[in-house]
Amino acid sequence: MGELGAILRIQVQREPLKAPHGWYDPSRIVAVDEAELTSLGLVGIRGGERIVDAHHADHPRSRGGGRRALSVGFRGHYEAMAARFGERVRLGIAGENLVVDGPAVRMEDLTGGLVVVTADGVEVELRAPRPAAPCREFTTFLLGGREPRPRDELVDELEFLSGGTRGFIVSVGHLTAPVVLRVGDVVRVG
């Protein structure tokens, strides 16, 4: 597949999107101009403010303890979600950290991982991609609800969002030095 596209959006979750209330709250997603990526996760930078992502190992309410340090979504998946769920689907609403201006991809397209090529020419490997499992809270939100619906009422929607449509979680534990990512950096298959 080669080049997939440029990073359209970088964002962090200031706080977990489901806790403490139990429903999906996208107001905690913050778009940033750039972000520092380390083996522990992502720290967004906006107007000089450093915002630690909720999945970063050092966040006080860390989601995943650093095991889900970075996630990536694609414009093509957002187009598919918007066609199915309508106007509630805005770019970045699924909460992934990087949104790439590229087509919908399948897991088999990403077996070699992803590489971000920064404007400075630095290549950053994003290893071992795996589909982000869709949750009841996000799926209920897309359907216009607040309190999560029972799983048996969401079977078709959860199936639609699985396999990468909801985004991919990648490994960054191998990184040995911080790297700054910016909107416009190019993403390609590894």
Give a label for each model feature.
Residues M1-G190:
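Metal-cofactor-dependent catalytic cores
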